[in-house]
Amino acid sequence: MTHKRDSAPFRNFLTSIFLIVFLFSPSEKPPVFGQSITQQDQTILPSSDFNPCIRILSIDGGGVRGIIPAAVLERIEEETGEPVSRLFDFISGTSTGAVISLALTKPSEKDSQKAQFSAKDIVGFYERDSRILFPPPSTETEENRFLTSTKYSPEPPLNIFRQTFGKTGLKKSLVPILVPTYNIKEKKPFFFKSWVKSTNDYPMSEVARAAVAAPGYFPPVELPAHRQTSSPKQTMVLVDGGVFANNPMRYALENSYQLGNIRKGIFLLSLGTGKTSPEHPRESPYHWEEAQWPSPLKNLLFADPPISNQESSSQITLRMEPVIPAENAAMDNAREQNLLTLRNISKQMMNQNRPAFKRILRILKTPRPAGCFREGNLPD
């Protein structure tokens, strides 16, 4: 069933978001917190009595740099004593962030009400399997690039995702999940939405595979059209949603604000995968032969929609993203030392911003106010 709604309330809602960005260089003293990246001159944190109805998690794309947000979530689970699937009411992730989101909301085979994987398990996945997904250069990888115009074979991620998710369908996720991808066949974004009953229930393994199909790294993924009424011959050809929404926070807000009573507050935790300093800007991680990809895809690359930096007493977005050295920025640098460095940077970010991190923990541990949720009203 499609839910009609006026877009004006959402536009007004977006303009009332209060954005706090945590940015620091691992080799420098972290700046104080401010209202934007360029105005870090005053300490501004959520008030101690802020108790939002809706708690949203958004996780960026970034390949192996996904170990940065995974380590943050590991610390959150350790200090709250609760799994991510109980702390948040809605989760969205792009690319590697999608894999994290899916894994943390996959129900256990022994107890369908509990998550099978912890954030600690996800960190272990990066440490254990990254080199399988992104093997070092070899004759085999060069042959694969020659034959498919992509750097890596699609078989390793497919095998890992099938082992991880089995036959579990997306609609079994413990909380609503939003995964952005891009349909190059129709030249428009496609969002996997776990809560929409009128669409096919794609296996989590296939959703993950489409989510990480970064142009130039892995080939596109062809899946049946999403509507149950579609002809079996109708298909989608999907690539990594990072080509238009590497940071999915806006889409998370747009799709989740009908989840409950927004007048009682919304808290969005946005986790980045690291950015390089202005002196050493990170090159786009996506590369492809011009003849292979439609020009709209190239124009969309990293064109994340802007988010307003205005204060509101009932909607707060907290973004955590460290500055990382340029030599650690490649999305496919799966060397053990690089993963250790990224994990340590994540820990340093949390430790040096301990007051803010404690406030995040307090918000997540506080029971939600009464009368928060309305059932069955997420938009299709």
PLM region spans:
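C-terminal helical/tail subdomains of lipid-metabolizing enzymes
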Residues: N51, T148, P219, L223-L238, ...
